[in-house]
């Protein structure tokens, strides 16, 4: 079997020493994919390979031969999630058959940045279709176009999602780094279940332009990698301010008039929603690899969010081991830390409706901007109709109930929507993460990422145990998940969370933790069945 991908640092050193060419790196990655993705364990993480990958590699080799190096990531291959537009020969479908053949007319900002850095976009990864916003009964990692991605640690286990293929591809050693997207948990959850590192950046740090959306208030794009160092190297490429992105500008895209009538007398207009508050000077441009300090936990004050435990005894046991490792590395724990909004479940009723409102508007905007002129898909209603007409292929396992709810929503100037966004943002920020950090003078919070992977169940859908991503999702704040241990051969991670634009701090803390525990294991590609003892 072809060996797994070297790390980013190893590839960089090999290229610098002339030990390998970009073409050879790309060919090795393609060989690994060929051996594992549709053959052997059949991980099914890759939905499409880039037919131009070898030609791109040759061009990058020629640049190196002439002394030109675009960035430290020159020549490094990357796989990107199939909701990130590329204006090339590849499709961009969000896993949906409705978009097959309607190739994007331009690169997304992320794809453009990867190319400008000299990275080779090797292909697209499978995902939970439409980033898991179609149905309440979905199976993470399944799409009508791509089928079901499996977990490389045990092949009958779910990889989680929605960036399922991106996490499974890194865990399987196809490439050192991939790109995922997250609205709520879609980077950190699959990274946790597949035993790799995932960084969910602050909303606004990475441009969303050209990414098939769910939510303009919560969507973000980030790296998935085998190590924090590799993820930080990719984050340097991705984290570029973009005036075309409303979150990067820090300007809420909907103008609300104070004279707009409320739907009911009780629904008064609150302040206009906002994106995460930017530091002076705007979106920070940081070298995240400069944060890779093995002593980075010394003197750090970290709050333990006990309210986010208890959903899995296995996750709880690994979490206790992780807390001991944090102390051993020099951190000071505040245990427990109370998150004020955690005691008030009322805001939870607003979270999905906000996504439904924003999905309907966001898809129409993406289709108008990135699909070819005359495309038969221009709205969510068109996607719903396509699914109904092609139900045997698109809905063999689960329906489109969330799509139907979203289509029934009104516009983004609806006061009910505006107030709902404000309520959940307050729960995530002023009464949530910000409150916990400020009250205890903390650098970050920590909690289990999720439980060990459950079995794939296409008939009933995901068996969700629990996770810690929601507060950061509604706040628009960053998360980093790192492998912390294993139970029965299945990985379990912990998540560091912080305030707006604390991404660099979280990279520093997570790197130091990773070096302290050093638990990462290659997946065993174990066939389905009874798990081994812990």
Task: Kindly label every feature range from the protein language model.
Residues 1-65, 261, 321-324, 328-331, ...:
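An N-terminal boundary/leader segment
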Residues 35, 116, 120, 171-306, ...:
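Structural helix-boundary/capping segments
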């Amino acid at each position: 079997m072809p060996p797994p991908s070297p790390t980013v640092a190893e590839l960089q050193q090999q290229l610098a020493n002339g030990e390998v060419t970009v073409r050879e790196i790309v060919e090795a990655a393609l060989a690994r994919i060929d051996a594992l993705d549709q053959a052997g364990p059949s991980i099914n993480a890759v939905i499409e390979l880039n037919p131009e990958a070898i030609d791109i590699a040759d061009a990058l080799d020629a640049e190196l031969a002439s002394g030109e190096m675009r960035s430290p990531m020159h020549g490094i291959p990357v796989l990107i999630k199939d909701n990130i537009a590329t204006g090339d020969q590849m499709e961009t479908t969000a896993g949906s058959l409705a978009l097959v053949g309607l190739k994007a007319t331009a690169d997304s900002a992320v794809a453009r940045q990867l190319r400008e850095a000299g990275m080779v976009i090797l292909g697209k990864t499978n995902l939970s279709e439409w980033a898991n916003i179609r149905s309440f009964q979905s199976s993470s990692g399944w799409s009508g176009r791509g089928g079901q991605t499996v977990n490389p640690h045990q092949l009958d286990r779910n990889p989680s999602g929605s960036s399922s293929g991106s996490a499974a591809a890194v865990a399987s050693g196809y490439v050192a780094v991939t790109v995922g997207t997250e609205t709520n948990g879609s980077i950190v959850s699959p990274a946790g279940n597949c035993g790799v590192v995932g960084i969910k950046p602050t909303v606004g740090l990475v441009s969303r332009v050209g990414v098939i959306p769910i939510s303009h208030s919560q969507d973000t794009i980030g790296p998935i990698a085998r190590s924090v160092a590799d993820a930080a190297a990719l984050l340097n490429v991705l984290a570029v301010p973009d005036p075309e992105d409303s979150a990067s500008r820090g300007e809420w895209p909907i103008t609300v008039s104070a004279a707009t009538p409320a739907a009911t007398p009780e629904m008064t207009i609150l302040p206009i929603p906002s994106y995460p508050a930017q530091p002076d000077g705007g979106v920070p441009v940081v070298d995240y690899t400069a944060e890779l300090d093995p002593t980075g936990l010394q003197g750090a004050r970290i709050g333990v969010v006990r309210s986010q435990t208890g959903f899995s005894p296995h996750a709880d046991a690994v979490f206790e081991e992780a807390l001991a490792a944090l102390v051993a590395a020099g951190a000071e724990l505040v245990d427990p830390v109370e998150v004020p909004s955690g005691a008030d479940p009322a805001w939870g009723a607003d979270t999905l409706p906000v996504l439904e409102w924003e999905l309907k508007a966001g898809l129409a905007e993406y289709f108008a901007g990135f699909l070819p002129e005359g495309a038969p898909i221009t709205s969510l209603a068109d996607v719903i109709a396509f699914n109904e007409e092609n139900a045997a292929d698109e809905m063999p396992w689960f329906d489109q109930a969330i799509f139907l709810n979203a289509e029934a929503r009104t516009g983004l100037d609806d006061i009910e929507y505006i107030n709902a966004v404000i309520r959940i943002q307050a729960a995530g920020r002023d009464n949530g993460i910000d409150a916990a950090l400020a009250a205890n003078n903390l650098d970050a919070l920590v909690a289990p990422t999720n439980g060990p992977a459950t079995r794939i169940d296409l008939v009933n859908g995901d068996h969700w145990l629990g996770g810690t991503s929601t507060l950061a999702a509604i706040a628009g704040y960053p998360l980093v998940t790192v492998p912390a241990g294993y139970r029965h051969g299945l990985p379990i991670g912990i998540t560091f969370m912080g305030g707006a634009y604390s991404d660099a701090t979280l990279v520093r803390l997570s790197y130091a933790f990773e070096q302290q525990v050093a638990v990462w294991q290659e997946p065993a590609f174990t066939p389905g069945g009874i798990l081994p003892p812990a």
